[in-house]
């Protein structure tokens, strides 16, 4: 089946008010394809600014993180209801930097994912293996474990987009070959078919992330199981528009 092409931009802990405004102004001026869904995730401090500045109907705003409970005494956290309150509609969960640096577990990420969905926030769920795990031949085992934590407590995946990000390729300049990505995505979809059912698995979009840029994005064009990209550093640059247009 044809799944709508999806491009996410994760700004990480980058940007100032002026830079965020400039990035969004560049998107506003671009002739973006009407059939490509775009979500940009600025730092939490700039979510409201991004919502106000964005004029593109195909571009939505997302958070980079969300807590697994409603608002309360959780210093430093971002609640799902607050994401919606400022006009954003998506959040990332499970990014490898939070798994490794913040030590978030599969189970905690699953709880955050479920709470966001239950609150009405759509989720880009990040999964992926380290270089050691890849060399050990357990890429799909790792991805399956990370996915299973979520599928155990979430049955409806209609508002989840999966982002496969091999940890060794994030911000390193190294990227999985299109063939490697397609093979892994195919395996991820096959696993999802077992855990959430073939129909949902077929509809779930699976993005590739890991040193995607304006030049290599086109190389993935004919890969049937690569439904888009989650872009890091390049989302801060004008070439982000080229990535959005890479299926044209």
Curated annotation (Swiss-Prot):
Active site, renumbered: 95, 165
UniProt binding sites for substrate: 10, 12
Known catalytic reactions: D-glyceraldehyde 3-phosphate = dihydroxyacetone phosphate
Primary localisation category: cytoplasm
Entry superkingdom: Eukaryota
UniProt KW DNA damage keyword: no
SUPFAM superfamilies (alphabetical): Triosephosphate isomerase (TIM)
Keywords from the named record: Cytoplasm, Gluconeogenesis, Glycolysis, Isomerase
Class of the enzyme per the UniProt entry, highest EC level: isomerase
Cellular component aspect of the GO annotation: cell surface; cytoplasm; cytosol; fungal biofilm matrix; fungal-type cell wall; hyphal cell wall
EC number(s) given by UniProt: 5.3.1.1
Pathway note: Carbohydrate biosynthesis; gluconeogenesis; Carbohydrate degradation; glycolysis; D-glyceraldehyde 3-phosphate from glycerone phosphate: step 1/1
Any one biological process term the GO annotation gives: cellular response to starvation
Compartment annotation: Cytoplasm
Entry's transmembrane regions: none
InterPro entries: Aldolase_TIM (IPR013785), TIM_sf (IPR035990), TrioseP_Isoase_bac/euk (IPR022896), Triosephosphate_isomerase (IPR000652), Triosephosphate_isomerase_AS (IPR020861)
Stretches of the chain forming a coiled coil according to its record: none
GO molecular function: triose-phosphate isomerase activity
Similarity section: Belongs to the triosephosphate isomerase family.
Subunit and partners: Homodimer.
NCBIfam families: tim
Note: Has antigenic properties.
Protein name: Triosephosphate isomerase
Origin organism lineage: Eukaryota, Fungi, Dikarya, Ascomycota, Saccharomycotina
